[in-house]
Curated annotation (Swiss-Prot):
GO molecular function: ribosomal large subunit binding
Disulfide bonds: none
CDD domains: RRF (cd00520)
Protein source organism: Thioalkalivibrio sulfidiphilus (strain HL-EbGR7)
Cellular component terms per the entry's GO annotation: cytosol
Chain coiled-coil ranges: none
Keyword Protein biosynthesis among UniProt keywords: yes
Localization (cell): Cytoplasm
InterPro entries from the UniProt entry: Ribosome_recyc_fac (IPR002661), Ribosome_recyc_fac_dom (IPR023584), RRF_sf (IPR036191)
Principal place of residence: cytoplasm
GO terms classed as biological process: cytoplasmic translational termination
Protein name according to UniProt: Ribosome-recycling factor
Length: 185
């Protein structure tokens, strides 16, 4: 009984951390990486698709991405999609290749991004604590229904608390890495 509740809680906490990593990957640091353009949508024959489905995205050097659309007709659409995204990038096309230089971040912008990153991490912590609460409520319901003893409930709650602590520690680790990455000049 309690095992399924613990497994569910662990899986959901893992998803919260994965979600945090995905959100943080979208936040631009001064360094170029291909996941930066993952959420940029390009119009392709009437429907919006992710840029990765219409072009190759590669890292040329530490501050430059190259985007190579698979069809020559898509060059201007891909360039426009990157320009109009909320990333503040200015792509330039040279024939069939689009180069996307990463502008250096100002100190003020870095501090703003650190605040955003901390907010995302706090959201992940809250989500993990909510999962703990849900699991504990499920355990209480089992005790009420006399399916498990109060001792079993206490043991399971302790294990869920350990899970919560380890996942929140993981969130803090991910946050520290991203902050360090943001503050590098």
């Amino acid at each position: 009984m309690t095992d399924s509740i613990k497994k569910d809680a662990k899986a959901r906490m893992g998803k919260s951390i994965e979600s945090l990593r995905n959100e943080l990957a979208k936040i631009r640091t001064g360094r170029a990486h291909t996941s930066l353009l993952d959420h940029v949508m390009v119009e392709y024959y009437g429907s919006d698709v992710p840029i990765s489905q219409v072009a190759n995205v590669n890292v040329e050097d530490a501050r430059t991405l190259t985007v190579t659309p698979w069809e020559k007709t898509m060059v201007s659409k891909v360039e426009k999609a990157i320009m109009t995204s909320d990333l503040g990038l200015n792509p330039s096309s040279m024939g069939t290749v689009i180069r996307v230089p990463m502008p250096a971040l100002t100190e003020e912008r870095r501090r703003d991004l650190v605040k955003v990153v901390r907010g995302e991490a706090e959201n992940a912590r809250v989500a993990i604590r909510n999962i703990r609460r849900d699991a504990n409520n499920a355990l209480k319901a089992l005790v009420k229904g006399k399916e498990i003893s109060e001792d079993d409930e206490r043991r399971a709650q302790d294990e869920i608390q350990k899970l919560t602590d380890s996942h929140i520690e993981e969130v803090d680790k991910v946050l520290a890495e991203k902050e360090k990455e943001l503050m590098e000049v």
